[in-house]
Swiss-Prot record:
Lineage, broadest ranks: Bacteria, Bacillati, Bacillota, Bacilli, Bacillales
Function: The RuvA-RuvB-RuvC complex processes Holliday junction (HJ) DNA during genetic recombination and DNA repair, while the RuvA-RuvB complex plays an important role in the rescue of blocked DNA replication forks via replication fork reversal (RFR). RuvA specifically binds to HJ cruciform DNA, conferring on it an open structure. The RuvB hexamer acts as an ATP-dependent pump, pulling dsDNA into and through the RuvAB complex. RuvB forms 2 homohexamers on either side of HJ DNA bound by 1 or 2 RuvA tetramers; 4 subunits per hexamer contact DNA at a time.
Organism the protein comes from: Staphylococcus aureus (strain bovine RF122 / ET3-1)
Pfam families according to UniProt: AAA_lid_4 (PF17864), RuvB_C (PF05491), RuvB_N (PF05496)
Head domain (RuvB-H): region residues: 256-334
Domain notes: Has 3 domains, the large (RuvB-L) and small ATPase (RuvB-S) domains and the C-terminal head (RuvB-H) domain. The head domain binds DNA, while the ATPase domains jointly bind ATP, ADP or are empty depending on the state of the subunit in the translocation cycle. During a single DNA translocation step the structure of each domain remains the same, but their relative positions change.
Gene name of the encoded protein: ruvB
Large ATPase domain (RuvB-L) as annotated region, ranges: 1-182
Ranges where the record places region Small ATPAse domain (RuvB-S): 183-253
Catalytically driven reaction(s): ATP + H2O = ADP + phosphate + H(+)
GO biological process, one term: DNA recombination
Family annotation (InterPro entries): AAA+_ATPase, AAA_lid_4, DNA_helicase_Holl-junc_RuvB, P-loop_NTPase, RuvB-like_N, RuvB_C, WH-like_DNA-bd_sf, WH_DNA-bd_sf
Main location: cytoplasm
Entry protein name: Holliday junction branch migration complex subunit RuvB
HAMAP family reported for this sequence: DNA_HJ_migration_RuvB
Locations listed in the record: Cytoplasm
Length: 334
């Protein structure tokens, strides 16, 4: 699958860029106000008790700031953070090596925690509850269990699939925080801040236009801003103006709802070739040349959220709203 401008996952070349934009304190973090308010209380209370923060589960769509929040938690608690991904912890020994290296109060951030193997997850349970590990050494008759005491720590788990977590793992998190899509006002503020970091000016209309097309996701907003800045610099404009913004977004094929050419391809397939549906997911996948899981995990959620697509027992179906939007878009292109 080619990388899309509106893909909410991080592109391979964006790591350093995203790091440069990330706030380091709660007061700098834009949006997610309910989460910020709760975290301020939880962190202050933990520090007053001289205890680690309870284990925290962050969940929601990609690109909304789960990794950023994990680092902010460590900064606010004034401790170190160790970051790993769920799939990288293949054996109990991998987890034991990391946990035994933590200092009291440290944060362990596990991204994609829903992808932990079952054997690693079972070893994690006593570590989360009672701060010890039971490790089996040897095989067969010579196998024996060794208990390793751990310093108190905070586990921050992040997932885009909270429903895929097992009940025992989910229940061991004392704090559950769901990140929501950002409103246009917060995205506009993020875009203006990013433009300052990039050293470029941007007019108000452009910031609003980019916010509208960013799919409620700061990562998408920053990516679109970078590409619009390319057009501004080639045009030798003193700042980003609305005319350049609309021209650039048109060439990038990102419409006013944040939908790109793949979204249009999928919806036109359902509307034109299958009379609006219902049509099976496998049929759509074959018709547009994409994998079923990619459609289900990457393309569908936003189309459903915007009210253009409906899941039914018989397959996917275009909504009346979709007919209006995509018919108009097709007329404008013709």
């Amino acid at each position: 699958m080619n990388e899309r401008m509106v893909d909410q996952s991080m592109h391979s070349e964006e790591t350093d860029f995203e790091l440069s934009l990330r706030p380091t304190r709660l007061r700098q973090y834009i949006g997610q106000n309910s989460i910020k308010s709760n975290l301020e209380v939880f962190i202050k209370a933990a520090k007053l008790r001289h205890e680690p923060l309870d284990h925290v589960l962050l969940f929601g769509p990609p690109g909304l700031g789960k990794t950023t929040l994990s680092n902010i938690i460590a900064n606010e608690m004034e401790v170190n953070i160790r970051t790993v991904s769920g799939p990288s912890l293949e054996r109990p020994g991998d987890l034991a090596a990391i946990l035994s290296g933590l200092q009291p109060g440290d944060v362990l951030f596990i991204d994609e925690i829903h992808r932990l193997s079952s054997v690693v997850e079972e070893v994690l349970y006593p570590a989360m509850e009672d701060f010890f590990l039971d490790i089996i050494i040897g095989k067969g008759d010579e196998a024996r269990s060794i208990r390793i005491d751990l310093p108190p720590f905070t586990l921050v788990g992040a997932t885009t699939r909270a429903g895929s977590l097992t009940g025992p793992l989910r229940d061991r998190f004392g704090v559950h925080l769901r990140l929501e899509y950002y409103n246009e006002s917060d995205l506009k503020e993020i875009i203006i801040r990013t433009a300052e970091v990039l050293g470029t000016g941007i007019d108000d209309e452009s910031a609003i236009e980019l916010a509208k097309r960013s799919r409620g996701t700061p990562r998408v907003a920053n990516r679109l801003l970078k590409r619009v800045r390319d057009f501004q610099q080639v045009n030798e404009d003193e700042q980003i103006y609305i005319e350049t913004t609309k021209h650039a977004l048109g060439l990038l094929q990102v419409d006013q709802h944040g939908l790109d050419y793949i979204d249009h391809k999928m919806m036109n397939c359902i509307i034109k070739q299958y009379n609006g549906g219902p049509v099976g997911l496998d049929t759509i996948a074959v018709t547009i040349g994409e994998e079923r899981i990619t459609i289900e995990d990457v393309y569908e959620p936003f189309l459903i959220q915007k009210g253009f697509l409906e899941r039914t027992p018989r397959g996917r179906k275009a909504t009346p709203l979709a007919y209006g939007h995509f018919a108009k878009s097709n007329e404008e292109r013709e």
